[in-house]
Amino acid sequence: MKEVILNQEQMDLLKDHAVKCGSNESCAMLLGIHNEQQWNVKEVFLTRNADGDSEITFTIPPEELLYGYQLADEKHLELVGIFHSHPNSIAVPSNTDKKFMKLNGDIPWIIFSGINTDFKAYILDEDIEEIPIKIKERHFFQ
């Protein structure tokens, strides 16, 4: 079964980032390990939103995007997810999200709703498919 795996500390970090951004969309790169059915997040790289004070769009600044990929490479990880928030709506991909999901291939998008304070994950297969988020226990000796 397809799933995104995060620990509670990572979920809290993403939620705090979204809350700090208030009514503007927040964004982050999720780095980790991917096999055919699982995207296992090992590191969260919080980014700024280059769209500034936008409630409805996000763009990761090019220099932060590049740094995120370099960080993944240094740690022998890969991009396993793109996170952003919908401060004033539910956690469902917008038409803009769907367009950019097509450009990002087999990478889940994790969306946080500022209304419901919940997370949902989506992958583009033949169509947009919601996939479960599994919360794992954090082991300090991984």
What are these regions (language model features)?
Residues 1-79, 88-142:
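Conserved beta-strand-loop surface patch within small alpha/beta domains used
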